[in-house]
Amino acid sequence: MKPLLLSLMITWMYSVSGTAQEIINLYSGDTPNSTYPKAKAPAKESGGLVRKVINPTLEVYLPDKDKASGKAVVICPGGGYKVIVYEGEGISAAREFAKHGIAAFVLKYRIPEDSLIVDKKIGPLQDALQAIKIVRENARQWGVDVNKVGIMGFSAGGHLASSVATMYNDAGVANSTGTNLRPDFQILVYPVISMQDSLTHLDSRTNLLGKNPDKATIDRFSTELRITKNTPPAYLTHAADDKLVDVDNSIIYFEKLRHNNVPVELHIYPKGGHGFIFRHPGWMEPLFEWINKL
């Protein structure tokens, strides 16, 4: 596939800093692994939440040129693989990244539904890898360094982001150009990591893998088991009192990375619960300190 011609894919454009400059269709032709491969229907959106994504997109937030660092991050909002918390976790984070000189791309990925995706297990991963591909192939236009492209995810979106970081060679993405799909860094915020019975967020697992996945499938999508010495550096943050996604998800991922000599930083807050970013506005400050060192 030739690099995407963004001039054919731009939905709308603004020039104001902090506002999205473009919304881009992930696929210029048929959507792979879709029950509606030619459909371009908009997703259902209400109250900042997104449902029923048939046509996945990237929403682009670029920093002012005099602040641009060359770094970029693809953001995967959470929502238990049932909805996408698009505004609260996607757009809000993207604006902050742009203010700090980092290009941000909010991913509206396909939510795993049997009615919309042929093999729903890999649908979100295909979309996230395609997003990395698009950012790298169009890096020059956006002032991005191809060697500074990361992935970020919240909650179930953290599972998706960690899947990209550990399974970037494990999903069917049309990549005739040989574009590097490995992210250069990963940022995981109260992430779902494991699909194992003892640790998983059951609703996220059921929505992604179905009600009764076999052991091989559970192991394949337990991203702590997919870590190698080539896994990209990671920043994780979680609250110890998270009652929805056990903090041990972040801890086990941290330990696996550490034992593979992968640079990793973990911030655990004693209180905050799940979704603590909505109650602690300064949560990104240590993240920016970390990312500035990359």
Give the residues covered by each predicted segment.
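Mobile cap/lid helix-loop segments that gate and shape the active-site cleft of serine hydrolases
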Residues: K44-E45, P191-R226, P232
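Short beta-strand element of the alpha/beta-hydrolase
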Residues: S69-G78
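Primarily recognizes the serine-hydrolase "nucleophile elbow" in alpha/beta-hydrolase
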Residues: Q130-T200, I218-D219, T223
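Short beta-strand/loop motif that positions the catalytic acidic residue
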Residues: Y235-H238, D242
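Catalytic nucleophile-loop/oxyanion-hole region of alpha/beta-hydrolase
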Residues: V85-Y86, G90-A93, L107-V146, F278, ...
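C-terminal catalytic histidine-bearing segment of alpha/beta-hydrolase fold enzymes
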Residues: V247-L294
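N-terminal cap/lid segment of alpha/beta-hydrolase-fold proteins
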Residues: Q21-K67
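Bacterial Sec-dependent N-terminal signal peptides
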Residues: M1-I23, L294
